């Protein structure tokens, strides 16, 4: 088997090794495709070197095929297509005992804190697996993880049909949030300065606006008939969006924090009092979000094919990262880890 190891300084080594036989409760996968995530790009830029052990095999947006099953594992057979929910929770802390394993107090994120998926063979705990139905191929399967992020965001927002949602930021996650929001019957507006990303939103069938040349608050006021947005998703991670989110939310609107802000941004707390706003955090996903994401793909409600910008072999992972780094128009780059599949 081969694995791509991040070695720092925007560099990878592809090394040959041995597949790890599954222990009790584990399954070994032949990895199909792995998506390059925004978090992977942060690692690539060295932002997370203090957290990520170097060298490390990163990657967590993965589809694959069951190759070997460990003792005690039930419900899976060799040859089945699966995806991995890349969270390793302790099961013992108060948060896990409350059923919130995705925000476990001792959570390890696979592909960041522990070895990840940019390898041809990956052995994981069976509890992290979700099956793919026959109609969902491995390329689409590699996007189940980011789609699950969007499903969790929308589920946290309590968004319903007929409501109006504004998404601040039209990157891959923002566009997936737009797609999920549209699937529940909401009217959707994506605020994004990048021309190609606004075009992508338009092709998804949602509205878009450039906040750099349009007064966003005035635009939303007109779009909603002065009511304001029912839900605002902050997906950009930039300060202007933080300033806008409280302005454009309507009375008793819900604001969902999706982006990670590295420094504490100033927030207009007066608007929370004046409008009775809600601020909701949304971190990763739960099992139900993976199930929902798979159903959205299998039912045809969301087509993920337009999100795939490129596919590269594992041997060319360095070029795949470099190309994504220089392509702000790109959505999702996939790395193919077993070309024969």
UniProtKB/Swiss-Prot annotation:
It comes from the Bacteria. The keyword tRNA-binding does not apply. InterPro entries: ADH-like_C, ADH-like_N, ADH_Zn_CS, GroES-like_sf, NAD(P)-bd_dom_sf, PKS_ER, Zn_alcohol_dh. SMART domains: PKS_ER. The active site is at residues 39, 42. It catalyses: 2-dehydro-3-deoxy-L-galactonate + NAD(+) = 3-deoxy-D-glycero-2,5-hexodiulosonate + NADH + H(+). Pfam families: ADH_N, ADH_zinc_N. Keywords: Carbohydrate metabolism, Metal-binding, NAD, Oxidoreductase, Zinc. Zn(2+) 2 binds at residues 90, 93, 96, 104. Involved in the degradation of 3,6-anhydro-L-galactose, which is the major monomeric sugar of red macroalgae. Catalyzes the third step of the pathway, the NAD(+)-dependent oxidation of 2-dehydro-3-deoxy-L-galactonate (L-KDGal) to 3-deoxy-D-glycero-2,5-hexodiulosonate (L-DDGal). Belongs to the zinc-containing alcohol dehydrogenase family. This is 2-dehydro-3-deoxy-L-galactonate 5-dehydrogenase. It comes from Pseudoalteromonas atlantica (strain T6c / ATCC BAA-1087).
């Amino acid at each position: 088997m081969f694995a791509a190891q991040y070695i720092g300084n925007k560099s990878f080594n592809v090394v040959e090794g041995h597949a790890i036989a599954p222990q009790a409760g584990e399954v070994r996968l032949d990895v199909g495709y792995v998506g390059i995530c925004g978090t992977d790009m942060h690692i690539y830029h060295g932002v997370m070197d203090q957290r990520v052990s170097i060298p490390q095999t990163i990657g967590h947006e993965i589809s694959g095929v069951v190759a070997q099953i460990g003792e005690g594992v039930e419900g899976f057979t060799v040859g089945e297509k699966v995806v991995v929910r890349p969270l390793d929770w302790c099961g013992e802390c108060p948060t896990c005992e409350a059923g919130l394993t995705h925000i476990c107090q001792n959570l390890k994120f696979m592909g960041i804190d522990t070895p990840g998926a940019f390898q041809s063979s990956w052995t994981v705990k069976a509890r992290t697996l979700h099956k793919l139905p026959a109609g969902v191929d491995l390329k689409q399967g590699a996007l189940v993880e980011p789609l699950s992020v969007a499903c969790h965001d929308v589920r946290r927002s309590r968004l319903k049909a007929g409501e109006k949602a504004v998404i601040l930021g039209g990157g891959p996650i923002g566009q997936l949030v737009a797609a999920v929001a549209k699937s529940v019957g909401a009217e959707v507006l994506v605020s994004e300065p990048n021309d190609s990303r606004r075009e992508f939103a338009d092709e998804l069938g949602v509205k878009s606006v450039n906040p750099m040349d349009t007064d966003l608050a005035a635009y939303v006021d007109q779009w909603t008939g002065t009511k304001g947005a029912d839900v605002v998703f902050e997906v950009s991670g930039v300060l202007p969006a933080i300033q806008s989110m409280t302005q454009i939310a309507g009375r008793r609107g819900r604001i969902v924090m999706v982006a990670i802000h590295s420094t504490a941004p100033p927030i207009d707390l007066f608007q929370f009092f004046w409008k009775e706003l809600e601020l909701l955090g949304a971190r990763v996903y739960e099992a139900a979000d993976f199930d929902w994401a798979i159903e959205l793909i299998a039912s045809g409600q969301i087509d993920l094919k337009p999100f795939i910008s490129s596919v590269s072999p594992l041997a060319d992972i360095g070029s795949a990262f470099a190309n994504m780094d220089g392509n702000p128009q790109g959505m999702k780059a996939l790395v193919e880890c077993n070309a024969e599949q």
